[in-house]
Amino acid sequence: MGMDYTPRQIVEQLDQFIVGQKQAKKSVAVALRNRYRRMKLDEGFRDEIVPKNILMIGPTGVGKTEIARRLAKLVGAPFIKVEATKFTEVGYVGRDVESMVRDLVEMAVRMVKEEKMAGVMNEAEEEANKRLVKLLVPESKKKPAMKNPFEMLFQSDGSDGDDETTEQDSHDEIRSKRKRIAHQLALGELEDHIVSVEIDEVPPSMFDMLQGSGMEQMGMNMQDAFGQFMPKKKKKRNLPVSEARKVLTQQEAQKLVDMDEVAQEATSRAEGSGIIFIDEIDKVAGKQENAANVSREGVQRDILPIVEGSTVVTKHGTVKTDHMLFVAAGAFHMSKPSDLIPELQGRFPIRVELEKLTVEDFKRILTEPSNALIKQYQLMLQTEGINVEFTDEAIERLAEIAYQVNQNTDNIGARRLHTILEKLLEDLSYEAPEITMEKVEITVGYVDDKLSSIVQDKDLSQFIL
């Protein structure tokens, strides 16, 4: 876990993926560092320190979600993103707000299970190789038991001794074969050999109909209860040794992992370091003018106890939300943060306003991050043997176009660059397998040729860019 990062180090890490938005990065970095500080306090005082939840305000595509997602990945914390508009007030058809906590716990269980399985992978692979040897050289079929009592009377006297000798010879032969096969497996000589492997068959859930109705938890509990009484079905699959080894290693690793211990550690991690990102919070804010807004206020009132700190029942046990970090975000075009109910406003003491992207920001987004868009397209086209180079003037022109289209139509932030680059390189991507040139240079002239007519026609740019 990277909980011991300093705020400055956290911001530096976020800078590798997200351009600008210094204030938002500082706020989340301090919130994360406060968790580390809290863990170093005496246990008696630790429970008194509650996380300072964050409300991010800014248009779409400026980095709100990405900041929270990268932050969680950085420290290995359980993280989920939910949309406030997906929830309904208790009593209505739809998902209830407690499902976000259950989803977070499920995420934590997956994380901890993967970590535990990674820790026993060497031992699991050894066991998998032993099973492979047995599958490649199976036991000889035993002589069928006597079904007729007269067989014992008429059986010749020396047959028992002969059978024992034959059986011993058979065992020795199998042992010798298995030793030889184990050596061949170690050398990788049998990787393409086909072997029959038994795997658990996952039956279709009879409770899928409960999805989205707010009754998922009841469905999961019923399925677990029935699962204990109903034996697991097995099915055989013919796989190459290389694939069979992966399947068997996973099976053996699961046997070595204590799921009770996993559930306990996962709930503890979700409670102490879980991050829940609630997007579109502005869509449930609004003045009480009609019935729809009354329902929105109901969602806010349901979210309130979760954010304040309450106990939620999950299939892995009860989970407290007191020390989870909640990050809410919204564009607030049609409403203001003050339109949220006062109690909920008070639970998000840190307000961060993210800035709109400038031409300079777009230039940096295209080139600076470690996963920059231009790098992505260059690597994709390199697989076809084409090296694509962008001139500085072309990059500047792309940034200007993105900014201009955002100003003239809907402002979708950095996501505009995806659309523009896809349109720019559409022909090149289509013809790439047939192009013999090793290097293609994207100049400002090429950009203007492909995009200027679309940008100038406002109606057309609304549909294409």
From Swiss-Prot:
Keywords: ATP-binding, Chaperone, Cytoplasm, Nucleotide-binding. It is found in: Cytoplasm. Gene3D superfamilies: 1.10.8.60, P-loop containing nucleotide triphosphate hydrolases (3.40.50.300). The keyword Chaperone applies. GO terms for cellular component: HslUV protease complex. GO terms for biological process: protein unfolding; proteolysis involved in protein catabolic process. HAMAP family: HslU. A double ring-shaped homohexamer of HslV is capped on each side by a ring-shaped HslU homohexamer. The assembly of the HslU/HslV complex is dependent on binding of ATP. Belongs to the ClpX chaperone family. HslU subfamily. ATPase subunit of a proteasome-like degradation complex; this subunit has chaperone activity. The binding of ATP and its subsequent hydrolysis by HslU are essential for unfolding of protein substrates subsequently hydrolyzed by HslV. HslU recognizes the N-terminal part of its protein substrates and unfolds these before they are guided to HslV for hydrolysis. This is ATP-dependent protease ATPase subunit HslU.
